[in-house]
Design a protein with these regions (language model features):
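Conserved P-loop
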Residues: 1-63
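Short, well-ordered coil/turn elements that cap or connect secondary structure elements
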Residues: 19-21, 66, 99, 116-117
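Short, glycine/charged-enriched secondary-structure capping and boundary segments
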Residues: 14-18, 41-42, 86-90, 118-122, ...
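Phosphate-binding/switch loop-helix module in NTP-utilizing enzymes
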Residues: 38-100
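Conserved nucleotide-binding/hydrolysis micro-motifs of P-loop NTPases
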Residues: 5-9, 32-34, 78-79, 110-113, ...
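Phosphate-binding/switch region of NTP-binding enzymes
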Residues: 109-144
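Sensor-1/coupling segment of RecA-like P-loop NTPase cores
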Residues: 94-112
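Structural signal for conserved beta-strand scaffold positions within catalytic alpha/beta enzyme cores
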Residues: 26-28, 106, 124
Length: 144
């Protein structure tokens, strides 16, 4: 699992996956979510996020080309593409030329049409109602 946005701290899915031991490798290479308040992101902050995403992209390409994996999860890569931290055409090219046996999962909101076009399966999850909207905090074992 290569995380493009998340920094690797405080995410419940990581705690669960750690229990699988060596069966799962997690590389958290992001600087955290950046656009909760887009107007307050400085140019310097944006450049740090872009540099981290570019480093994550280089690592991803190396791992894809290594042919060492059956599955690679590109966590929040759609967000990174949407925020223009990673070029969508580079991702499409990688998807078209990855080893045939390699399965990939791309997560995150705002998948570009170019990504959807090359995908075999696309699933969209939408919140209909969420406890957070009522002020109910995240629950251990549910959200983390």
């Amino acid at each position: 699992i290569l995380q493009f946005i998340k920094s690797g701290h405080g995410y419940g899915e990581l705690e669960g996956l750690k229990k699988l031991g060596d069966a799962v490798t997690i590389k958290s290479m992001g600087k955290g979510f950046i656009y909760y308040n887009r107007d307050k992101v400085t140019v310097e902050e944006l450049e740090k996020h872009k540099a981290a995403a570019q480093e994550a992209w280089k690592t991803l390409v190396e791992e894809v080309n290594s042919d060492n994996w059956d599955l690679i999860v590109m966590d929040e890569i759609n967000n990174a593409i949407n925020y223009e931290l990673i070029d969508v055409n580079s991702v499409v090219d990688m998807l078209k030329h990855k080893p045939e046996r390699l399965h990939v999962i791309l997560t995150g909101r705002y998948a570009k049409p170019e990504i959807i076009d090359v995908a075999d399966t696309v699933t969209e999850m939408n919140v209909v109602k969420h406890a957070y909207e009522k002020g109910i905090k995240a629950a251990r074992g549910i959200e983390f």
